[in-house]
Every structure is written in C-alpha cells, then in structure tokens.
Amino acid sequence: MKPCKVAIIGSGNIGTDLMIKILRHGKHVEMGAMVGIDPTSEGLARATRLGVPVTAAGIDGLLAMPEFGEIRIAFDATSAGAHARHNATLQAHNVRVIDLTPAAIGPYVVPSVNAGEHLDAPNLNMVTCGGQATIPIVAAVASVTPVHYAEIVASIASKSAGPGTRDNIDEFTETTSRAIESVGGARRGKAIIVLNPAEPPLIMRDTVCCLIDEADTAAIEAAVHAMVERMQGYVPGYRLKQRVQFDRIDTPVNVPGLGPTTGLKVTVFLEVEGAAHYLPAYAGNLDIMTSAALACAERVAQALGNHHALSAAS
C-alpha cells in the first residue's frame, strides 16, 4: 500500500518532533508538507534541510502548495484558537485532521484505549499530554471495576512548556477532565497540571488516583501492567515508577460531584521519558503527544488505504 501523504501545521517543537518521527518511523504515512507562519523558524529550516516541502504562509500557504492535492491527513500542532479555522478549511478539501491542540472539535483518541473506534471521523482530537499518559491507566482500572472518580496530576518540566501550552492551561484541564470520563470510563474526572521549574529539568511524571468499590486488587494490578506494556509499544519511555498502591477509605471523604464516599483508592505513579528525536529526553510530555499522533495517523492511513483498495476492486 502506498504511504499516505501528510501535512503538519505548526513548525514549533511539537510539529518538528512529529516530522522527524514520521521521517524516521512512518510506515503508512510520509511527509508531504510542513506549514508555519515564521519564515525564520527552526522547524521550517530543518524541514527544508530534510527535503520536506514548506510554507511560511500558514493554512492559506498550504492550500497554494502544489503538493496539497496529495495530502490526505493533516496534523494541527498550533493552538486551540487557530484550530477551528484550520479544521473548517481542511474539511472543505476532504482532508482528515488529527488535532494536537485542546480544541476538541472531534472525538478524543488515546491509541492504546480507543484507536479503532473513530477511524472514519473527519477530525480526531489527541486530548493532551497528561491525558495521553494517564487515561490509559484509568481505562485499565475501569476494565476491572467501575471507577467512581479519577484524578490525575501531570507534572512537566517548565522548560518543555512553550507558549502554546501556557496559553492553553485552562483548555488542558477541561479537555483532560472530560476525556478521563468519556475515554477512561470514570464517572467523574479531574485533571491538574504542574509546571516544574526545577533545574536541571525533570522528566514528565504523572499520578493517577482512582476511587472504586472493593475489587480484585491483583486483577487491577495485572490490568495496569498490561496497559503499560501496550503503551510502551509506541512510547518506549513510558513506565511505572513503583508498584500500584491500594488504600482503603473507611471514613467518608467528599468527592467532587459524588459527595461523601468510601471505598478503595488506587494510586499509580508514572514517568514518561522522551525518545529525544528532536526534543530533549525530559520533554516526555511532548514526546507522548507526537508518538500518539503518529500511532493514530498510521491507523487512519491504513483505513484510508483499505477503503481505497475496496473501492478500486468494486
């Protein structure tokens, strides 16, 4: 099957790292264009050196490129505010969109949990870095027993948080909280992000807490380990920091949206080290987003290729 041509909109850290991942590891996708708005950006310069067609004229520049007619999938690595226009423009040209912003126009996708559920959707949202790291764990627990409440804390190196991340803090917490419920399966979800200013920068660390009824702790631990292994298939630096912890709550505690609650608290500590393709190893928060986006695009490209093959056969 011929690889699917893709464009990346946004030549910053995430867009550049994603480009390098596609160039090195793309199986069903290949670079067709890199789009930015700053002619002097390092991302566009690097793309040019690597032989990728570029434009510094944004989405309008992409439409004017001779290569645009071959583009089947576009990644948006800009901002939630800009994404609405980008999406509308691309949809008008029948281009599938993979959204790396918190705009959440399309369904949430976490490849290890629901990659196969929305392959026909015109727009797929990759949630957030914190969501990509923690929602699989919530889903693992929920596969064993109902999760009444899940709370995640994503701690990332301040140095790895660019202007887009900082401008989208509110969208980050809102989008991640909703996806904890809709993808992770928790009845209620809450997300917190911490920008850690420590020097030297620390790698991404995540804490996942789930409140459940009494359940088979061995089955939960096995489900968590299986999910970690699945995650490592596309994010090799994803790992469990220590054993899954279980604490019984006999005295009722007030849970947002649920009221006084007792039960079993499951706590999982994670760390995510980046592959250092372009970004430093401590920027696991960015690496997990680009890795998840590539994994998602591979599935979409396969589906597009299969559909094209079936149409040709008929």
Swiss-Prot record:
InterPro entries: Acetaldehyde_dehydrogenase (IPR003361), Acetylaldehyde_DH_C (IPR015426), NAD(P)-bd_dom_sf (IPR036291), Semialdehyde_DH_NAD-bd (IPR000534)
Alphabetical list of CDD domains matching this protein: ALDH_C
Binding site for NAD(+): S11, G12, N13, I14, S160, A161, G162, P163, G164, T165, R166, D167, N168, N285
Pfam families recorded: AcetDehyd-dimer, Semialdhyde_dh
Catalysed transformations (reactions): acetaldehyde + NAD(+) + CoA = acetyl-CoA + NADH + H(+)
GO molecular function, one term: NAD binding
Biological process, per Gene Ontology: catabolic process
EC number annotated for this UniProt entry: 1.2.1.10
Keywords: Aromatic hydrocarbons catabolism, NAD, Oxidoreductase, Plasmid
Active site residues according to the UniProt entry: C129 (acyl-thioester intermediate)
Family: Belongs to the acetaldehyde dehydrogenase family.
NCBIfam families registered for this protein in UniProt: ac_ald_DH_ac (TIGR03215), PRK08300.1 (NF006157)
Protein name listed in UniProt: Acetaldehyde dehydrogenase 2
Taxonomic source organism: Cupriavidus metallidurans (strain ATCC 43123 / DSM 2839 / NBRC 102507 / CH34) (Ralstonia metallidurans)
